[in-house]
């Protein structure tokens, strides 16, 4: 393998190892949680990872890109743009199920019961974090759509706004009086 190809597999391999470690720890019984703990932890990890890479990729594009006279990204910045474009879909795909999983986890009911008995709206209304996941999913969708529609350098600056909002929405939700 050439060094760039090996480097391209480093990040997904690291993610896979971390996901397996988190799953093994939570499934070991050392963590006193519910059955929803593993999917919620993996959803948090996947969405956080994808969101951080999207935000970092946008910053990388804005700092290092050398656009041509028409404002089109150079080849190296375009590679970063492709990473942002693809991981925004992963971010969105992780955030959407997290809305239901977080609402169910906060209500301490299984997701299937909450969805089948019509408690989804009440679950979202009672869970601040589930509403934050709606914000994350919306931000990820905006980035996924907009990054797909343009390869001009100027459009990457406004994309920082939903990226920052999406990355910080879940961590800043709640208050100091709430538990971990």
Locations of the language-model features?
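Polytopic transmembrane helical bundles with strong interfacial aromatic enrichment
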Residues: 1-180
């Amino acid at each position: 393998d050439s060094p760039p190809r090996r480097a391209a597999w480093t990040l997904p391999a690291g993610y896979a190892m971390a996901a397996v470690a988190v799953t093994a720890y939570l499934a070991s019984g050392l963590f006193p949680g519910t059955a929803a703990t593993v999917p919620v932890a993996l959803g948090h990890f996947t969405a956080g990872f994808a969101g951080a890479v999207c935000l970092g990729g946008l910053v990388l594009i804005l700092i290092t890109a050398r656009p041509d006279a028409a404002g089109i990204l150079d080849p190296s910045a375009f590679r970063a743009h492709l990473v942002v474009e693809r991981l925004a879909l992963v971010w969105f795909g992780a955030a959407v199920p997290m809305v239901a999983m977080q609402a169910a986890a906060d209500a301490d009911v299984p997701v299937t019961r909450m969805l089948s008995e019509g408690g989804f709206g009440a679950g979202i209304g009672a869970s601040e974090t589930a509403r934050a996941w709606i914000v994350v999913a919306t931000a990820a969708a905006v980035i996924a759509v907009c990054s797909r529609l343009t390869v001009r350098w100027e459009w990457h600056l406004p994309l920082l706004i939903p990226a920052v909002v999406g990355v910080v929405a879940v961590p800043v939700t709640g208050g100091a009086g709430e538990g971990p």
